């Protein structure tokens, strides 16, 4: 039977094979042959933890027997093409020969690691975002992966949440544009091509709104705020044709996301028209028991009935759904719906036509970590850095200078990777020391000192650094984190600084300090590294801080005392080269923040598109009694959304409207002239914001509705235009109707959310 299905699939032309009518006929015929248990088996996603991950798969393994019996629809976590072929061969030996899908977390590259997604978002370059997904898909498919658990599109307003590193920041409009770019890059124009993968949009929904920034925590949002402030990136991904979604760990309105009918069915499918399937996050079905809504059988029934199609890692569907159907607790139509959607995904991927379509012998050695991948990673990292401060134009540095490069992240290859890096070649990252020394070869000099520990508390540093290893390899011996006294490390760095013209300090977070399960209540640069910075400042030498981080940090001392701050995030394999490119001016920095940097953790959650209160207070104004502000800090962030410096300067004309009235069917052009007033060519991201002055519901003080990244040569002026329609002015009102309300709107254009010029537009 397996051979018959495969050969019949190969008979038609590509257009016929991938046509919807042909697909529906094929799947309907296949499902008629499937037992209830086999249908439920398609709803089961198992992990590589089930198997011994070596070259040999035991025929006696329970998991292999389940696979042959059709009890698994997909597997995740495998990156060895030989193993993937072996497992697919086992699946094809089953009664109906239904191929497996192979999924994996490909968050910012596979073998070649790109900058973390938060860093990529600060490029504001949608072409680069799309290309990053396309390049990652090439590596993923080269090892046999055809389904990636990306993009992560959760909006986050609270930097305490570690998974802010995986998303695009705090703005739902920008997040939506970036989500579409990722989907286009991963899926291309033909899912059955051997270099495209099916995207899995996560974490649906509202996971980034976790209370107090504590991972997996409850989410408390109204439906109106959810739609206006958080859901747009998920919506845009659906409209872009994303093939699958992943449900989130959190609850919404008292119902876990993995069994939330409002999210899974009413919004995703009925309102947005999503046609693909939804998989749970890892063990999220079982975790609903801890939420207190039922035992394993109950949560499995509730999940599939609400619209969850695939269970990742809980084995709850396989364990309980057949009996639930027979007893009437679950309608068989729910099983059929989910099974059909998963079979459709396999069909669209071309797996029925050729289950081994990605597994071309030797392709992995050609595609992985090659020159093109490394070159692209460097280019992407160049545009994913944000210059926060540059007092007296200290940067760019001269390559003839004597540079003291110090800090625990200056020569640390593995810590360039960032969280959720999948590469098995982390040690081949270009360190910042390597990058700078290559750049100055034959001219200046770069001396190096480690400078400090990460934390003064060795036990805490060990918990953070080795946390994952202690979970997955508890018997593995681990080296001590502190081998040289802190005072000695600082003294060595100070000595290097005194002999240099300029000091570059590389400080911030190690990989495990951000990402999943990495919530923090203190967002300062860790204490040991602060000791180092203060000692370096005392030398009187110019101080450049290179910030390696996966989230916004509180940088009050650094902003006051450092001469320059370059926020380089976690940039991946080409970090050292890209940082050197920017520090020496071979590349003019053009990144702009997509998330606010707080002055104090007490300001969180903090976001530019907040609403006014009945007692508003200017963000930068000092404390005043009986208005909405703090006694001890201004409302404004230290660095605002959209902010980022360049080695040149730009000036803006006042924005102009083609008409001051906007009809229901018409459009208005907003134009502004931007002049490069400096001496270097540079890229500028021109941003357009709106504000509904009077509305039936309260509205944010600003909302991003457009941006253009343009290259402007020194001394030249470019006219930048935006086209607005009433669609751009719409929001979800109190009744959740998506409307543009007539009246006056402020249209704001500028270089960031704070530095804007305004004009008024009337919507009819």
Residue ranges and their predicted role:
Residues 738-740:
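Surface-exposed, short loops/turns at beta-strand junctions within beta-sandwich domains
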Residues 8-733, 742-753:
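Glycoside hydrolase catalytic-domain context in secreted enzymes
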Residues 1-8:
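Bacterial N-terminal signal peptides
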Residues 755-764:
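Short beta-strand elements
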